[in-house]
Amino acid sequence: MAVVPASLSGQDVGSFAYLTIKDRIPQILTKVIDTLHRHKSEFFENHGEEGVEAEKKAISLLSKLRNELQTDKPIIPLVEKFVDTDIWNQYLEYQQSLLNESDGKSRWFYSPWLFVECYMYRRIHEAIIQSPPIDYFDVFKESKEQNFYESQESVIALCTHLQQLIKTIEDLDENQLKDEFFKLLQISLWGNKCDLSLSGGESSSQKTDVLNSLEDLKPFILLNDMEHLWSLLSNCKKTREKASVTRVYIVLDNSGFELVTDLILANFLLSSELATEVHFYGKTIPWFVSDTTIHDFNWLIEQVKHGNHKWMSKCGADWEEYVKMGKWVYHDHIFWTLPHEYCAMPQVAPDLYAELQKAHLILFKGDLNYRKLTGDRKWEFSVPFHQALNGFHPAPLCTIRTLKAEIQVGLKPGQGEQLMASEPCWWTSGKYGIFQYDGPL
């Protein structure tokens, strides 16, 4: 196997990884501490003095974490026994074994960025679970819900579009169906712009009707493998026997508006018979500010169902029905909130890898998935995506992301360098997007 390049890390002063560790992560921790402060009276109402003491304890643990980060202290093992604690601590030992540092300790700015950023969110969770009776509290819940509420007009526009489309779907010829599929894929792509971890937890909602912007946004799609997705799924549809299934898996990213765009796409896949089942993979714990948990998934469907617009509530009712019928299935697994790159999945989570192998197509949403797919490494821009996956090929897969990290592979020779010369922030601003496919053609 070819030599893999070094990991992105905070060692590179001025890099996006460096600025994330130096500025964005402390900002997120400060916001989490503030959120706990603001819920003090709620904790008192629900749990009395015990709730207030728990809030103080959680804040103290989080303040300690912020100090460790800002002073580049060694990264310490997790202490609270949880289902993944041992795996995390083994991974920390593994990272330490790779170091040349004189004291052999992993530190925030010298360890791989992917590891320390995941570790920070896992330590936030540890601070909460160490603080009963408020150990159920999702410190990011408010901002996820706000993102959904602030995107209402866009949600209504998408639900209306979908319901009108479903009415006429049987009359569409193959090219028209393909056009609609491409449209909803692009909506799911641009929905990925709404990422609260990039904005430091500040509002990042969708206030304009993305449907009307698709033509204008096309030049910003750097890699467009939508044709491969169409030919794969339309071929599955044509060759499917009566009782057989076509499974599309969506490895989710953000809750709120982006999740709505993913559910709209999933609805279309069933209505068009391009798929017979859609499986969603989310996070087991609150993660990267806006990532989807089972609570977020169920909450959002409930909100859409009770929306004050007939097509919106029709979508919500349909989605609830899909879940009941088993046509939509939500899964979570601890692997998605571990620091490992995905090429380690067969060893670390063989059960999950075996599950993914049952898919006809896996859609990986967003930046964190892309970073884990490619190992978050300093790849050359023109390295083939298949190579950067480093042996991770459970099923045909496609990554759908707007670029918000200094990693991108599979570009034409010179394309990345050209963008870098004209627009230095091209790969971190969320302005550009990709549909990047790996699988049989």
UniProtKB/Swiss-Prot annotation:
S-adenosyl-L-methionine binds at E258, D291. Substrate binds at D253, N254, D367, L368, N369, Y370, R371, K404. InterPro entries: ARMT-1-like_metal-bd_sf, ARMT1, ARMT1-like_metal-bd. GO terms for biological process: DNA damage response; methylation. Automethylated. The modification Phosphoserine is found at S102. Pfam families: ARMT1-like_dom. Its EC number is 3.1.3.-, 2.1.1.-. Transmembrane segments: none annotated. Keywords: Acetylation, DNA damage, Hydrolase, Manganese, Metal-binding, Methyltransferase, Nickel, Phosphoprotein, S-adenosyl-L-methionine, Transferase. The modification N-acetylalanine is found at A2. GO terms for molecular function: fructose 6-phosphate aldolase activity; fructose-1-phosphatase activity; metal ion binding; protein carboxyl O-methyltransferase activity; protein-glutamate O-methyltransferase activity; S-adenosylmethionine-dependent methyltransferase activity. Its cofactor is Mn(2+); Ni(2+). Mn(2+) binds at D253, N254, D291. GO terms for cellular component: nucleus. It catalyses: beta-D-fructose 1-phosphate + H2O = D-fructose + phosphate; beta-D-fructose 6-phosphate = dihydroxyacetone + D-glyceraldehyde 3-phosphate; L-glutamyl-[protein] + S-adenosyl-L-methionine = [protein]-L-glutamate 5-O-methyl ester + S-adenosyl-L-homocysteine. A motif (Subfamily III RTxK motif) lies at residues 401-404. Metal-dependent phosphatase that shows phosphatase activity against several substrates, including fructose-1-phosphate and fructose-6-phosphate. Its preference for fructose-1-phosphate, a strong glycating agent that causes DNA damage rather than a canonical yeast metabolite, suggests a damage-control function in hexose phosphate metabolism. Has also been shown to have O-methyltransferase activity that methylates glutamate residues of target proteins to form gamma-glutamyl methyl ester residues. Possibly methylates PCNA, suggesting it is involved in the DNA damage response. Belongs to the damage-control phosphatase family. Sugar phosphate phosphatase III subfamily. This is Damage-control phosphatase ARMT1.
